[in-house]
Structure formats: structure tokens, C-alpha cells
Amino acid sequence: MLKCTTRHVHIFAGEVTADNNFVPRDDLFTLDVDPDNELVWTDAALQKVYARFEELVEEYRGRDLTEYNIRRIGSDLEHFIRSLLKQGEIAYNLQGRAPNFSMGFPQIPAEEIVGQYIPKG
């Protein structure tokens, strides 16, 4: 099975059926965004990720379906998610089971810092 797994993006070449089985396919991708719920999403931000995914898949149309190409799509999508975080469209889920600032420390305006420790870069 061809797949790409990054911290916030899982892509599989195939589909999940109604009875929760996975069927490999060469003509369909399944996307799982932020499976560990490390980020807080709005519907609008999630739709942007899905739209960017569709654009990336379209850009690769006609190329061989290889693990390398799927990983490139996943990597590009991970960078896109990071840009959403930096723009403030999504945020870290500080209530998650294991908060992890894998995309950099949160950007907090200085006037909002009250008794918080912000590491010096």
C-alpha cells in the first residue's frame, strides 16, 4: 500500500469503505488531517487544507503513482498547514494529550503575555 505519513498529514492510496475496511486503489487518495488532534481547526481552515490537497493531486496527475510522489504531496501539505499556523488561522491544541510545538513555538503578541514563560530564541 502506498502511503505518506507526516506529523499532521496521512495520505493513503485507496479508500475506506462503509464497513471500515481499507481498499487499495491507484486512482483515489484518502486524506487524514491531524489524526492526533494537535491543532485547533476551524471549518474554513480545514477546507483550505482539502482544497490545497486537491490542487497538489491535480499537479501530479499523469505522473507515476510512487511513494516518492505521495510523500512530496504530503510534505507540501505539511508546509501549507504550518503557514496556516503562522498566519493564526489554526492554533495548537493545548488541551491535547501531548502538546507538541512541532511547527515552532506559538506566536503570542507581547501585549498578551501575562505571567507566561516564553523561551528565548
Swiss-Prot record:
Cellular location(s): Cellular thylakoid membrane
GO molecular function: oxidoreductase activity, acting on NAD(P)H, quinone or similar compound as acceptor; quinone binding
Enzyme Commission number: 7.1.1.-
Membrane-topology annotation of the record: Peripheral membrane protein
Superkingdom of source: Bacteria
Chief subcellular location: membrane
Gene Ontology cellular component list: plasma membrane-derived thylakoid membrane
Pfam families (alphabetical): NdhM
Catalysis performed (reactions): a plastoquinone + NADH + (n+1) H(+)(in) = a plastoquinol + NAD(+) + n H(+)(out); a plastoquinone + NADPH + (n+1) H(+)(in) = a plastoquinol + NADP(+) + n H(+)(out)
Family note: Belongs to the complex I NdhM subunit family.
Biological role stated in the UniProt entry: NDH-1 shuttles electrons from an unknown electron donor, via FMN and iron-sulfur (Fe-S) centers, to quinones in the respiratory and/or the photosynthetic chain. The immediate electron acceptor for the enzyme in this species is believed to be plastoquinone. Couples the redox reaction to proton translocation, and thus conserves the redox energy in a proton gradient. Cyanobacterial NDH-1 also plays a role in inorganic carbon-concentration.
Xref: PANTHER family: NAD(P)H-QUINONE OXIDOREDUCTASE SUBUNIT M, CHLOROPLASTIC (PTHR36900:SF1)
Protein's UniProt name: NAD(P)H-quinone oxidoreductase subunit M
Upper classification of the organism: Bacteria, Bacillati, Cyanobacteriota, Cyanophyceae, Synechococcales
Name of the coding gene: ndhM
